[in-house]
């Protein structure tokens, strides 16, 4: 069946151009930008080579791009480098030696509202710690080039330190998000064939202790290949189970390693894997996405410069958990490659009060904020008073990541957080791309902003929107997002499964990388990513994207957040239902429910009218802020909930169940 546009797309502001005086000196005409972009595409290898030369290589490459065996592309073939050296050593040789690299804040606050746990690390501190941990891995446990090291750690400085230490000796990191279950952890350990795991006794989350070591112990019952476990005493718990001969305390190991220890960085090949990161598919077991070293470094370095316009006095904060790819690229590697100062925070965004993030921005003078649309929508619900209590005037750039941002959330953040003076962009990329692909780029050429768009593709990335047959669609028509040429940060494959790599990404449209997202390209060349193509509700043959419906809900002045899922229907095949969180002070009524139905009919069309609307006070989300729509669908269909270990707040599911049962009973009548 051919892909059809909706009768009426969600109202997207294709022609709403936002300018502000603070950035006027940076503005570039759209056609000027695309001329530069086209030149980069036509001279792809020389373009990326010029970027790569800005980094230090132990040995230069012999060939920029080896395309002899597509889709197994190789970048900077013959070149040798080391990520730890690039992120730490080279700064220690300069004035940045005593510059702050990381300011870390734990979740607990004292009675005055000041953080109890704070740490500051200069680039020299980081250099010393990375070398000591590299020695711990290499000298104590024999970790060598190519070995996989699994890290199951919270958001503490030891996580980026250990990643850099592993890369220093040529090991491959396998970071597992600390919210994953024992089964999920075991699966990732086994697939990567890790023989060492690094974890912590626990950490703070919403004022509660989350124990980690016990999860590791349960996982290792199903992962017999692990020989050693290193345990960081984050909380100093006294009752942590330790297996003699296998488990070791981090601090005791480090006591035997002198502060001036130096481990020579391993000069690894450009195509040497730096990390494996597992990402869930719609079917089957998680995919172990593999990224190389040289191409990934060049991609992340370039996009940090272009997208974030890094300056020497910036205080940068990416709120992502390091267990996700955003944390790998834009918490660990990117800011340290640039020699900037960054914030790392352990806890929940709205604990103990909804202004926790705003207090952090004010306390440290954050200038660049990189966060998620889900977080922005959550803060919208709390209202403008909370950010209004704090001085956010240091912010000059805000970017979002992780999912499409609806225009209403964009406008709110731009006005309330940025005081209409920031450069604001919605970046698009994914685990497989390794770094940002589509975004406004205030560090390069800043074209006019549009609320809700991802902006134009960055230089060196040939992005298009195509139909079912792989042909480009006209401006304003929905299609599939693809990348037409290889790029440096692209995945190196799927760990141990090259056939799955080809089938998943390269078979749908031969010669093009299939992203799996719907998108629209407007007449100016800006890309509007609409969400996953598999997050589609098919109503009587019409395809409705969940993003389109949710954006329409949030555009209503009473709505803070919304999640839409499809449920089976005997006549239409499938119909949408919505779980809606109202703004504070708004009362849920039947009249409002009718008003929202009519609002959706007007915004999208009668075909999109939800069969049911449930009012809830919270949506089920992961700790990284992503809405767990599958749980809502399970509630509505009576299906098993499945794995809920990444769920931030279990009461959100119970509330959804209650709302569903109450409305169902009400509709059934006496």
UniProtKB/Swiss-Prot annotation:
Q: Which residues bind ATP?
A: 402-404, 426-431, 517, 532, 543
Question: Which residues of this UniProt protein bind CoA?
Answer: 205-208, 326, 601
Binding positions for Mg(2+)? 554, 556, 559
Q: Nucleotide-binding among the record's keywords?
A: yes
Q: Which cofactor is recorded for it?
A: Mg(2+)
Alphabetized Pfam families for the sequence: ACAS_N, AMP-binding, AMP-binding_C
PANTHER family in the cross-refs: ACETYL-COENZYME A SYNTHETASE
What name does this protein carry? Acetyl-coenzyme A synthetase
Q: What is the lineage of its organism?
A: Archaea, Thermoproteota, Thermoprotei, Thermoproteales, Thermoproteaceae
The gene it comes from is acsA
